[in-house]
Amino acid sequence: MVARGQLERLGERDSVIISAMDKVNAQKYDSVKDYMASLTDEQTVNDSRMLIEMMQRISGHEPKLWNVGTLGFDSYHYKYDSGREGDSFVIGFYPRKGKITVYLMDGTARFSELLAKLGKHTITGYCIYIKQLSNVELPVLEQIVRQSYEYIKSMSKDGPINRILWQTEK
C-alpha cells in the first residue's frame, strides 16, 4: 500500500498505477465488516478489534475503509498551495499479518518521549509499525493516538489544513 503523502515522492506514471491499484484493491470489500472477515491471522484480527475499539473511543466515529484495507476514523480536508486537495482520515491503521501500521497524520516526531515508553516498535515519518499489540504499552499507544487526533482536529477546525503536517519545515 502506498500511504498518503508517498505519492508526492513518486513519478507521475507510478502515482497513476498505484492509485489505480489502490482503487481495485479497495473495491474488493464493501464494508469494514467484509474486510475484517477477510483477515485470516487470528492475532491480526484480535489486534485490529482492539485498535478499532480504541480509535472509536477516541474519535467517536465508526471505522471507514480507505484505500487497500486502511481503517480510518473521522476525516479532515486538506488543500495545499500546489493545488492538491482532498480528504484524509484523522487517525487510522492498516492491519497485516506480523505488522500493523498505525498512522499519525501529524507525524511521529513530536511524540519522541511517549514513543520511548511505548515498547517494541519502529517508526517512519507518520507511521508506527507494531508486530503485535502485546509488544507495546496500550495506554501509551492510546495517549499518542489521542493527542494526534486532538491536534489534527484543532488544526482543521477553521478550514482545510494547508500543509503536510508530518513533514519537517525546510
Model-derived regions: residue spans:
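Charge-dense, helix-prone N-terminal extensions
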Residues: 6-7, 13-170
